[in-house]
A protein has these predicted regions:
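N-terminal signal peptide c-region/cleavage motif recognized by signal peptidases
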Residues: 18-20
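Bacterial N-terminal signal peptides that target proteins for export
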Residues: 1-9
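Gram-negative bacterial Sec-dependent N-terminal signal peptides
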Residues: 9-16
Length: 176
């Protein structure tokens, strides 16, 4: 069961790493497409911030057999550009699971895009910053992993919004 869960987590990581930021390649993680959103499964919560609609899927709306270690998936949908960011947030994980999952994510990212580069707030990123990963720990020694994949027109959406839309999820990292 534990190995199966790690395999599924690896598939999540691969899914988040497996897109091109090329505007002509409309593929996005989880079988979604960058750009206009016509139909999505019923979310746990929808909230709006200026030109961005956050569509949040919590564990209650995620298939437990396919995403057992997922706490949330957040879609950032821009008014004019459509879907421009997908954020995957793990449940809190013990050391061994976090280490194995991060090793798999780094291996996949490095294989696809080359060596990761350091980003802001102690993140690592690939593909010119289009895919970012970060991890935090709580006071009980458990760890949470965040991965964000950006769409091809995220900069335009961020300009309309007044600041980078990645700032929203990076606040969860709690790092200056």
């Amino acid at each position: 069961m534990w190995r199966r869960s790690i395999r599924l987590l690896t598939l999540i990581g691969v899914s988040l790493l497996s897109f091109s930021a090329n505007a002509f390649d409309e593929s996005a993680p989880f079988g979604l497409s960058w750009g206009p959103v016509d139909k999505i499964p019923t979310p746990s919560l929808v909230t709006r911030h200026g030109n961005i609609t956050l569509v949040i899927y919590r564990h209650d709306r995620l298939p437990p057999d396919q995403l057992p270690r997922t706490e949330e998936i957040v879609l950032q949908v821009c008014k004019n550009e459509g879907l421009q960011q997908i954020i995957w947030i793990s449940k809190f994980l013990p050391d061994s699971e976090e280490k194995m999952l991060l090793e798999n994510i780094f291996e996949q990212g490095d294989r696809r895009y080359g060596k990761a580069e350091a980003g802001e707030r102690e993140t690592l990123r690939w593909n010119g910053g289009q895919t970012t990963v970060a991890a935090i720990s709580n006071d009980q020694g458990l760890h949470r992993i965040f991965m964000a994949s950006n769409g091809p027109t995220i900069e335009t959406c961020s300009t309309d919004h007044g600041h980078p839309i990645s700032d929203h999820w990076m606040l969860l990292l709690g790092k200056p």
